[in-house]
Design a protein with these regions (language model features):
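Secondary-structure transition/capping motifs at alpha-helix termini
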Residues: 68-76, 97-110, 130, 134-139, ...
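Feature 926 captures the class I aminoacyl-tRNA synthetase adenylation module centered on the KMSKS loop
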Residues: 202, 395-455, 459, 503-546, ...
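Active-site-adjacent "gating/activation" loops or surface patches in catalytic cores
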Residues: 253-259, 448-478, 644, 648-651
Length: 886
């Protein structure tokens, strides 16, 4: 038997209670069950560096919708949650926290610093878990992981050793992003590029043996000390005769060659560029092609070094810039200085300008490892949704460079490389060896560096299932099915997971990558601290409930596209939850303790058949859209059905048989049975999107069932397909809308009933419409809905409404009181006459037109136009009424 709902829906009163019930009953938990097909996804682990933002809310809502959907379809659905140690991000946060306490990180020491960082992790990982629970995510908390937990650390060490032994990992010198403040290498993902105002300094480079010179424009004159060549385009006729000659390097006693390289854009600037291989990634590649020396002019803190700095040694890079520009000008090398805006890379954590430098680091050779990941897209083992991201993925993989995996920080997986204290031999393995294989020494020092965060994250789909051990979980749940993530980390994470999956398990880690966009503010701007436009999802949940936030994030959402966040949409989503609640409450109040039976003679009940048929089609459409990852489209179909067809139409149509059950108990039973069945199916379809409100309603509607989230997903059934009844009710809706429009246009109150005549030659349609006559009386304020084949007996002055396959007539005398309406319209005519005169007076006043703001003048013109249109309608209506009166 159904139970009644509270009068109003209060999210705060039910969300925590329901989530606790779900967890206590282990509804989110999955174990190996060979009788079921698994569906697995892993949560992109949020960093432990703070609170969740709106992007996390979107990402996890999408995942939760999919996992709830698959669970209801009968899959053994596993969603693995976890957090990322976020190496450098966390280290910066903890370092700053220590600074506020007056503690220096280096004085504290590595071990004590790591203790503090683990404390940070415990605090913030718990905060993130609590926030995710408030969102309603149904991940398996019994399997929660951390990228530095024992199992993940074991996998990381195993992979490093394996790749090293196979020759893929090596230590070498290459150009990398370097942070002079944090004193560590950085990935491209950790570098933010922003447009900054700067200058082009045009400098003379004298050509040796001539009186001529090359004019070079640079935004970084301080790197001149590291120049080892001037490059020009091979096809540039201006410079063909000087390729191979030497230039004098200003401010030094060195000479550098002029080389030809296709890297140069001959249309940009002077067509000649300085090459500084140790301080620019593009120059580094040019240098490799031409065997140029690599001169590093900077120390780790971005001061100029002693070896190549000369008089500028010890200066900060910007201090050196000023000094060098002054010397260039004094010595006649500076041609001109031109303002120029250009992109500058800064560390996303400490906001220091990043310095490209050649450093000895640990790298992964990528060319061979990338090949299976490329082939996966081409042979269909892996796909992106939307498909357009296939090209982006392939472009990055086909142009991939060796991957720098070492970081000069303490928080992270320490590199398992050990150096012999006697001879320097490098040994990579599980712990330090007993003795050096080269010299026999028994003393070793472990490499100080840690691994890049993404190195461990790349193993996430299989390390979380027990790899490198061949566990039952790994055998059953891996490969996973879908990865949900943003397009901004395809290169930094997705690609690395794919090649890691092939390298270590022989399989792609997932078969589908479902890409979503960014959540932007209402103006389309990226949410950021600097703009102050971030929106805290927890504040939205606190005010409107989790379901309202989830629905807002899905409204209009399309795979791969950015979305704008509007507070108005949150209110609309909350209103929808209230609408569903109130409709459900009405239904349950009328169900009471009635024993309902599946109705017989359904063909005699077009309204019941129509809504069952519409609901059946909805099940099919939603399922198809869910399977195509068109989650936003699926939600819009559910919304339209529940708000419009079910609440606004069917419930209103069902009221007559419910309220007149004594006259026709069979019709009342049919209406109530249909209401309950359609509500049950609708709640199931809506549940993945709005789990809390649907679960609460369902638990009261069918208290004998265990839980909505554990119920079966609805399926399309041919027996509930009623195209004839759909056609009848579609016509009925047009008739009701037409009558309502006429009543509104003529200002007829609902208290004034009328008779509507429907002239319809189609017998089947007419018969069906006749069965809906009682419903029409309430929905269109009618005395009666009369169906006939011709116009006989209908007054000549009746208002006609043309609808498909029929015409509706409303006798005018039943709609209005002529005297009363003429009096009302006469008063309206007088009012409009005054308004038109007032408006004309203002617009004919030259002072108003010339001195008032343009917007104010235009506003008055718009008012006048509206008044004139209204006056024309009033006059036309008055003339018509007076003519009928006479």
């Amino acid at each position: 038997m159904s139970e009644n709902l509270e009068k109003t829906y209060n999210p705060k009163a039910i969300e925590a209670k329901l989530y606790e019930k779900w967890c206590d009953n282990k509804y989110f938990h999955a174990e190996v069950d060979r009788s079921k097909k698994p569906f697995t996804t892993v949560m992109p682990p949020p960093n432990i560096t703070g609170k969740l933002h709106m992007g996390h809310a979107l990402d996890n809502t999408l995942q939760d919708i999919l996992i709830r959907y698959k669970r209801m379809q009968g899959y053994n659905a596993l969603w693995i949650p976890g957090t990322d140690h976020a190496a450098i991000s966390t280290e910066v946060k903890v370092t700053n926290q220590l600074k506020e306490e007056g503690i220096d990180k280096k004085e504290l020491g590595r071990e004590k610093f790591l203790e503090r960082t683990w404390q940070w992790k415990e605090e913030y990982a718990g905060t993130i878990e609590g926030q995710l629970k408030k969102l309603g995510v149904s991940c398996d908390w019994d399997r929660e992981r951390f990228t530095m937990d024992e199992g993940c650390s074991k996998a990381v060490e195993e992979v490093f050793i394996k790749l090293y032994n196979e020759g893929y990992i090596y230590k070498g010198s290459r150009i990398i992003n370097w942070c002079p403040v944090c004193k560590t290498s950085l990935s491209d993902a950790e570098v933010e590029h922003e447009e900054q105002d700067g200058f082009f300094w045009h400098i003379k480079y004298p050509i040796v043996g001539t009186d001529d010179y090359l004019e070079i424009a640079t935004t970084r004159p301080e790197t001149l000390l590291g120049d080892t060549a001037i490059a020009v385009h091979p096809d540039d006729e201006r410079y063909k005769d000087i390729v191979g000659k030497m230039c004098k390097l200003p401010l030094t006693d060195r000479e550098i060659p002029i080389v030809a390289d296709y890297y140069v854009d001959k249309e940009f600037g002077t067509g000649a560029v300085k090459i500084t291989p140790a301080h620019d990634p593009n120059d580094f590649e040019v240098g490799k092609r031409h065997n140029l020396p690599e001169i590093n002019i900077m120390n780790d803190d971005a001061t100029i070094n002693e070896q190549y700095g000369g008089k500028y040694a010890g200066m900060d890079r910007y201090e050196a810039r000023k000094a060098m520009v002054a010397d260039l000008e004094e010595q006649g090398y500076l041609v001109k200085v031109v303002p120029h805006s250009h992109n500058v890379g800064t560390h996303d954590r400490c906001h220091t300008t990043v310095e490209p430098m050649i450093k000895q680091q640990w790298f992964v050779k990528m060319e061979e490892l990338a090949k299976p990941a490329i082939e996966a897209i081409k042979n269909g083992d892996l796909r992106f949704v939307p498909e357009r991201f296939n090209k982006i993925y392939l472009h990055w993989l086909e142009n991939i460079r060796d991957w720098c995996i070492s970081r000069q920080i303490w928080w992270g997986h320490r590199i398992p490389a050990y150096y012999c204290d006697e001879c320097g031999e490098v040994v990579v393995g599980h712990g330090a060896p007993e003795k050096c294989p080269k010299c026999g020494c028994t003393h070793f020092t472990q490499d100080e560096d840690t691994l890049y965060t993404w190195f461990s994250s790349a193993l996430w789909p299989f390390s979380t299932l027990g790899w490198p051990d061949q566990t039952e979980d790994l055998d059953y749940f891996y490969p996973t099915d879908v990865l949900v993530t943003g397009y901004d980390i395809i290169f930094f994470w997705v690609i690395r997971m794919v090649f890691s999956g092939y390298a270590h398990t022989g399989k792609a880690p997932f078969h589908t990558v479902f890409i979503h966009g960014l959540v932007r503010d209402s103006q389309g701007r990226k949410m950021s601290k600097s703009l102050g436009n971030g929106i805290d999802p927890l504040e939205i949940i606190d005010q409107y409930g989790a379901d309202a936030l989830r629905m807002t994030l899905m409204t209009g959402n399309a795979p791969g596209n950015d979305m704008r966040f509007y507070n108005e949409r949150v209110e609309a989503s909350r209103n929808f939850a209230n609408k569903v609640w109130n409709a459900s409450r009405f239904i349950m109040m009328n169900l009471d303790e009635k024993e309902l039976k599946k109705p017989a003679n359904f063909e005699k009940r077009p309204a019941d058949c129509w809504i069952m048929s519409k609901c059946n089609s909805l099940v099919k459409d939603v399922t198809e859209n869910m399977d195509k990852f068109e989650l936003g489209i699926a939600l819009s179909k559910i919304y339209d059905f529940m708000w419009d067809e079910f609440c606004d139409w069917y419930i209103e149509m069902a009221k007559y048989p419910i309220y007149h059950a004594d006259e026709d108990p069979e019709a009342a039973n049919a209406a109530l049975w249909t209401l309950r069945e359609v509500l049950k199916k609708s709640l199931k379809l809506l549940h993945p999107y709005m789990p809390f409100v649907t679960e609460e309603i369902y638990s009261k509607l069918v208290p004998e069932e265990e839980s909505l989230m554990m119920s079966d997903w609805p399926v399309y059934e041919e027996e509930w397909n009623f195209p004839v009844d759909e056609n009848i009710v579609d016509h009925y809706k047009e008739i009701i809308r037409g009558i309502r429009n006429v009543r509104a246009e003529m200002n007829v109150p609902n208290s004034r009933k009328a008779t509507a005549f429907v002239v319809c030659e189609d017998e089947e349609l007419g018969a069906g419409l006749a069965l809906l006559g009682h419903a029409a009386q309430n929905m269109a304020a009618l005395n009666e809905l009369v169906i006939q084949k011709d116009k006989s007996g209908i007054a000549d002055d009746a208002v006609s409404i043309v609808v498909p396959d029929a015409t509706v007539y409303l006798p005018l005398e039943e709609l209005i009181d002529f005297e009363q309406e003429i009096e009302r319209l006469t008063k309206e005519e007088a009012r409009l006459t005054k308004e038109i005169a007032r408006s004309n007076g203002m617009l004919n006043n030259e002072k108003f037109v010339s001195k008032a703001p343009a917007a104010k003048v235009q506003e008055e013109r718009d008012k006048l136009e509206t008044y004139q249109q209204m006056m024309a309608q009033v006059k036309e209506r008055l003339e018509g009424l007076k003519a009928k009166q006479s």
